[in-house]
Amino acid sequence: MRYLQIIFIAICCLSGFVSVNAQIIPDHFSRPAYSYRSEQNPYYWKNKKPFDGYWQQDVEYAIKAAIDEKTDIVDGKVVLTYYNNSPDALPFVYFHLYQEAFQPETYVEELNLSNDVKPTYGKYEGAGLGTEVTEVKIIKRNGKKADEKTTLVQDISVLRVNLEKPIQPGENITIEIPFKTYFDTGSLRRRMKKFKSGDFMHYDGVHWYPRICVYDRKMGWDTDQHLGKEFYGDFGSFEVELTFASNYIVEATGYLENEQDMMPRSLREKLDIKNFANKPWEEQPSVIIPYVEGDKKTWKYYAINVHDFAFTADPNYRIGESMAFVNGQQVKCVALVQEGHAAFWQNAADYTKKIIETFSRDFTPYIWPKIIVADARDGMEYPMLTLDGGYDPSYRDLLIHEVGHMWYFGMVGNNETYRASLDEGFTQFLTAWGYRSIDGDYRVQFPEDNKYKAKYRKPDEIMMSEVYYAYLN
């Protein structure tokens, strides 16, 4: 009964947060005509305050980054406009440098050692290189050019930036931060992954840029050290340019604004997942776009009403698409699969469509223009992007779970470190709900490989495996 009460409260909170003007969904295939802070944005908090006196901070990120496929280094610059909507003057701000956590002599190492796990480190991790920031400039204040000094104090994965002048209530500043982030392959569970994909590297760009900490009315500054777990971010907009070697296929949070240049029709047809329906599992991928040393492409994305930005990139991604319908608008459902797995991902995009439509119908409408499920040896969620793995039918509950995170983690965006169960608990409930709605009460499985298993193995009941077993254990 207590479990059901928590679920009921979570559903009510979610519906209240995103149902205001839920019928007004922007054109899902081009940048909206309004900005995040506009009165025309149906999801901007000032247009639907939950109570008088409520406030939260606003962010506008502009990021340009190049990913070097030879060194595995992201070289970039963040330009962040930060709006102080609080009643407090802020003499300093904090940033998360998440990748700094995965090094020797950090809290993550201490946590592992206390559990009798001795980490091993890659060359960058061992050298203390995660996300490197050496200077922070204040280049504008309230939209006017500025040149204000800052001093930096770093405590592992949290960077404090002391300002020359406080940010007064109602003011905004624009912050410029050059940075480098290093992909690596140590034993610690970094979500920012690289791994070999054919003759090239696969990259998952997550928690990869300096991200300003949340300042909220309950906790003040959120300066929790990163331990490889949950997250919390301010809502706003992201304008991001990602430069890769020209043979890479990239997807990310937001609208791809130069789609015709990056993915012309002729190329899209060659990359279609249906072309590889009979490809043997793990067979060497074909070459669709030849690698030319020094030849680059820049992928340009814009996202609004999100609190984070992530990307995934692989020369061997092949693409499936389906269209979900939410409140009369289309939501593009994209499946990215490594070519050697394509035969077992043929239904991924269509299955994702069913997930989006089920949760939008039964809970509250999905508000973004697309959702991506990616074959990335993982199980993690970011706005509009899930990093997954496996194959059909065993990956179905994983896809449901990770896409389900878009509702509480994505659209509500609570402080997961402080109240982790709000997202994970609600999403576990969604996993069981979604599976039963789409496939029925029992898990879809491959036929048993021998007659004894076929005779004696009981069907896997979804409510038992996804909900009740957690209490029995």
Where are these regions (language model features)?
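Bacterial Sec-dependent N-terminal signal peptides
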Residues: 1-25
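Short aromatic-acidic-glycine turn motif
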Residues: 99-109, 248-251
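Glycine/proline-rich low-complexity spacer/linker segments in large multi-domain proteins
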Residues: 105-119, 123-124, 180-238, 259
